[in-house]
Amino acid sequence: AALVTEHLQFSLPYRALFSRHVTPDTVSRLLDALAVLLVRLHLLGLYWGDVSLSNTLFRRDAGAYSAYLVDAETGELRPKLSRGQREYDLDLARTNIIGELMDLQAGGFLGEDEDVIAIGDRIVERYNELWKELTEPELIPSDERWRVQERIDRLRELGFSVGELTMDSEPGGERFIIQPKVVDAGHYHRQVMRLTGIDAEEYQARRMLDDLEQYRAVHGLWDESTQVVAHRWMTDVFEPIVRAVPAELSAKLDPPQIFHEVLEHRWYMAQERGQDVPLDEVIESYLEKVLPQKRDE
C-alpha cells in the first residue's frame, strides 16, 4: 500500500529555518505557531502522540509562521479529548522541543546563553492561554452585554471564527455565562478566499484585508460593496506586485508573503524619506534589493 499526500509548497522543516543562527524571537514565533496547531487539532479531537518540531512543517505567514502536522502515524481521532490526553500531548511537546533546542545549541545554531527550558515552557503557556480563550465560560454582568461581542472579537484576533455561542443566566439574572460552542480556525483566510480566491495564511490574509480597507478609504469607495472594492484592489494593487516578480525569483516566497514584504518595504522607504513612495518604485526597489537575497522556499 502507498499513501500519496499533497506537497505543501513554500513550507520548511524547522532545521531549514535554523540553518543560520537565529534569534530567540524566531524560536518564539515557531512555538506560537505550533501551539496554535496543537489547539486546533485538540479541538477536532485529534490526539497527536508525537508532538515535536521535527514532525511539523512551517510556512511564513506575514511576520509570523503557520504550522502544519506532517507525521500523524501516532495520532488518534476521538469524539473529544480528555484533559489528561491533552496534557500528555502538551507535556510530550515540551519535552521533545527542549531536546530539539538542545541539539540546535550543540550544533551552534542557537546561542549557548539561551535558556532552552524556559523557551520550551513557552509552548505550554501559549497553549493554555489559547485553550482558555477558546473554550472556557466567562461570567459577565447582565448590564454589560457588549462584552459578548468583545469575546468574539478577541477570538477573531486569534484567527478563529465563532459559529455558535451559548449564553445562560445565573439564578437572579444578574450575570450571564457565555461560552464559545463552535469555533473554526481560519477566520481571515476564509474572508480573503471568498473575496479574491487567494489561498493565504491567516496573518497574510489579515494584512490583505487591512490594505483593502485602506484602498477603499484612499479612493473614497465607501458606497461600493466589499466584493467590488476587492476586485479593484486585486487589479490595482495585488496583481501588479505578483506580475512584477521575474520567473527566476518566483520560487523564493509565495505571492501572499511577497505582497506582505512589499508593504513592509514601502513602510520603511516612506519612513526614510518622510513621504509616501509610489508603488511602482517600491516594487522595483524590493525586487532589486530584498527578494534576491532570500533563499528559495
Predicted regions, residues:
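Conserved structural core of kinase catalytic domains
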Residues: 1-31
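Conserved kinase catalytic-core helix
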Residues: 20-49, 53-54, 90, 94
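Short, polar/flexible loop-turn hinges at active-site or ligand-entry regions and domain interfaces
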Residues: 22-24, 76-80, 104-109, 252
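Catalytic activation segment of kinase domains across protein kinase-like and atypical kinase folds
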Residues: 47, 53-103
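Regulatory N- and C-terminal appendages and interdomain linkers associated
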Residues: 101-297
